[in-house]
Amino acid sequence: MTVEQVTGTAPHTTTTAGREPFLARTKRALAGAPDAPLVLLGNVEVEDAWAVGEVGLPAVGGASATAALVHRMDELALLLAGPHDHVVLKAEPDPDHLAHLDALGVGLPTVHVAGSSDPLRTVTLDALDSPALLARLGELAADGVRLLAHGTSSAEEDLATATGLRSVLPDAATTKTVNSKVYSRGLCDELGVEQARGWACRTVEDFERACAEAARLVADGATVGVKDAYGVSGKGILVVDDPRRLDQLVRMVARRAARSGDDRLAVVVEVWADKATDLNYHFTVGRDGSVAFDFVKEAITEGGVHKGHRIPSRLPADQVEALAELSGRLGARLASDGFHGLVGVDALVRTDGRLLPVLEINARSNMSTYTVPLQERFQPDGWVALARQYPLVLDAPLPFAALHDLLGDLLPGAPGEAGLVVQGTGTVNAGASGPTSGATFAGRLHGLLVAPDDDTLTRLDRAVTERLASRPTGRPTEGDAR
């Protein structure tokens, strides 16, 4: 796209992103210069921090079985950063993987590893517990390096305070506000943006009314999703196709409120739309309020859990233009509420071909964010790509050298060749961080498949899946490879 669009008077100008590299555009918008040095922090699922103090769905407590795996997604930031940037990680990246990327011509950042690491903590909390790392980050701050986190919570504010690093993102309170699903529905109502039929619930009374209406629709055959305001990746969501389940949920919520004396609630209730294709589109809100539409990708999801993207989307040009125009309106509204940064919006194409342009707004880095520099380097014009995650069942750590031997000719030898670009090995071996006593554990391999056409892409994906499955192993004893 080359059309420049203006959605209102300056500074709320929306442009479609041109050929300047994504990282340079991001730095220009958020740090004021395309070559501004940054410290990147992959604190994925920051929603868990935002959800603290919120009253959501009744749930069983305890740590997620996949928390250790999710926290090792910090390594995704490695390939978003440039050679003059810095990345903080929970553990040392695999040196053979770094050598492989270097041989492919990827300019890698300087890596700083936390001295204290707990599998169940985010990379931010590990960094805060690492005095030597804090001192080094303080030196970078004195040199003018700034902080770009996946998203800002109070922990990232604490890190900025402890090191002197200035964040290129807004404060935690603002970021939390604009990432609520309740906020998202209200924003769309205000702008007149079509969304799934639903209700934003701030009190138990709101929830009772919403569920009464939803139960009638479910009785007529509809399916309803009940979502926590800060649920993510399939957590904090109930899919309901029986009105009795809604009645049960209302009773549970009402009893809890009666016991606590607190009738606050932060959930949304939505009627599931008939879906042909999931979408994720992405825009950047600059510090000056300008909005740049970055891209739209087809999203691959299973049960509400992100699994990958197909790139580029196969939307017709008029629908891409419609999403670009809407990005300007959404971005301007976010800017008026004090937000600047990266934004991904989940949407879908209905079975009749019409767009449902907003399911939820994620005003933070998205999974779609992290593959853009790889696309720019490894996906030639006219080629197709698949950002993919492969579940693994392992009985011992799988180093990159072994992965390289296993996948062999399925890995590209240079940009412009078809193959799988491996994003990291942190999630592959995250389950091995605790004692296994010979038991198996779940891992996950993230990568970007590139090919000249869809048929080749499909064959390549199948070949990678088969090679990975050819490793002899049992089934995981706990957790899953979500």
Regions found by a protein language model. Give the residues of each.
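Conserved anion/nucleotide-ligand pocket segment
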Residues: 221-238
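A long amphipathic alpha-helix within ATP-dependent nucleotide-binding catalytic cores
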Residues: 263, 271, 305-354, 392-417
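Peripheral (often C-terminal) accessory segments that flank ATP-dependent C-N-forming ligase machineries
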Residues: 379-482
